[in-house]
């Protein structure tokens, strides 16, 4: 478990942008049992690629005109059971953090794994997310 002085700023980076934190398996199930519409789920991490790439990219992407109906996050390595439950909704993908998933009507429609995040800037990540939003989300 990581100390709070490390994890809290990582949490607040997303929750401060409106992402709902899912800290327990029940939280995840509740979010996933509302299958209507779209939900962006960020699997957060304390690693540098989460801090410098994934979180900034996700926050930038949700400034677009077409955005998911809901945004949520689980914290890998901290809220382990919640993260494991979230990953159970992503069949066919190996555990990866950070990662970003888009669900539509309860089904996984887009997945950005760690290897697609590493070495890229926030704008590049946001661009890919915005393309997925344009394909799967309604306009504002």
Give short role names for the model-derived ranges.
Residues 83-97:
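Short acidic (Asp/Glu) patches
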Residues 57-59, 86-87, 133:
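Short, well-ordered amphipathic alpha-helices
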Residues 24, 43-44, 52, 74:
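Short His-Asn-centered micro-motif
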Residues 93-140:
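Non-catalytic, surface beta->alpha helical segment in thiol-disulfide oxidoreductase systems
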Residues 1-38, 137-140:
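N-terminal leader/targeting and pre-domain segments
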Residues 35-47:
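Short active-site neighborhood of thiol/selenol oxidoreductases, capturing the structured segment around
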Residues 51-64:
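Typically the conserved alpha-helix immediately C-terminal to a functionally engaged Cys/Sec
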Residues 43, 66-85:
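Thiol-based oxidoreductase modules, predominantly thioredoxin-like and allied folds used
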């Amino acid at each position: 478990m990581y100390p709070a002085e490390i994890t809290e700023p990582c949490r607040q980076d997303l929750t401060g942008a409106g992402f709902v934190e899912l800290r327990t398996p029940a939280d995840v199930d509740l979010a996933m049992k509302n299958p209507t519409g779209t939900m962006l789920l960020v699997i957060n991490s304390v690693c540098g690629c989460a801090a410098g790439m994934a979180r900034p990219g996700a926050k930038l992407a949700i400034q677009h005109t077409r955005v998911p109906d809901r945004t949520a996050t689980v914290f890998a390595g901290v809220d382990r059971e919640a993260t494991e439950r979230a990953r159970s909704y992503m069949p066919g993908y190996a555990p990866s953090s950070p990662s970003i998933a888009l669900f539509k009507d309860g089904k996984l429609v887009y997945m950005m794994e760690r290897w697609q995040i590493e070495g890229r800037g926030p704008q590049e990540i946001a661009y890919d997310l915005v393309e997925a939003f344009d394909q799967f989300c309604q306009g504002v």
